[in-house]
């Protein structure tokens, strides 16, 4: 697969054959493909897999994040009784997946519990919202090491986005079970 991705990157279209044989290439209209992408991602989350959706533009990311969040809310996987505005203009509630967009090495940016207590909040980390506080701060649990941290209202407003979908560049460095594009 590694050799194949290098061949594909260099323009060798025969490299697509491996992906097609494995059932990783799908055709359809853009709307159909996005619908399947969202459904497959939701199935990943329901199965407990760390999954991310990658898109080439921020507009596609915004659209995919909205679609995924809407389905999760309709299935009660993300709550709407108390929500908070994020830096990407989305609203997040308990159960939503968010991504932090700035490092926070201050005392308030250190995690508690999990397998890496004391880790700082990093740009690109993926979290699940566990509590929305009255002061508009969020308590979040790290997707991988399970540590929790309370993000200040200002940090949430300026540096936190929905984290179901990301641009390819923004997702660099993430380790997941499933990547959907």
Walk through the language-model features, giving the residues of each.
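Conserved helicase motor core of P-loop NTPases
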Residues: 1-123, 128-139
């Amino acid at each position: 697969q590694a050799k194949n991705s290098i061949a594909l990157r260099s323009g060798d279209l025969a490299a697509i054959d491996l992906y097609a044989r494995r059932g990783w290439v799908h055709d359809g209209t853009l709307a159909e493909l996005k619908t399947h992408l969202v459904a497959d991602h939701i199935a990943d989350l329901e199965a407990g897999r760390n999954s991310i959706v990658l898109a080439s533009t921020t507009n596609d990311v915004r659209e995919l994040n909205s679609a995924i969040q809407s389905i999760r809310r309709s299935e009660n996987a993300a709550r709407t009784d108390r929500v908070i505005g994020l830096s990407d203009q989305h609203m997040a509630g308990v159960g939503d997946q968010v991504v932090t967009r700035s490092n926070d090495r201050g005392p308030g940016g250190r995690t508690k519990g999990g397998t890496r207590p004391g880790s700082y909040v990093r740009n690109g980390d993926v979290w699940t919202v566990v509590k929305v506080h009255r002061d508009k701060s969020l308590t979040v649990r790290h997707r991988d090491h399970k540590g929790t941290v309370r993000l200040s209202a200002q940090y949430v407003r300026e540096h936190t986005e929905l984290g179901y979908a990301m641009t390819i560049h923004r997702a660099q460095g993430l380790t997941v079970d499933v990547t959907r594009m």
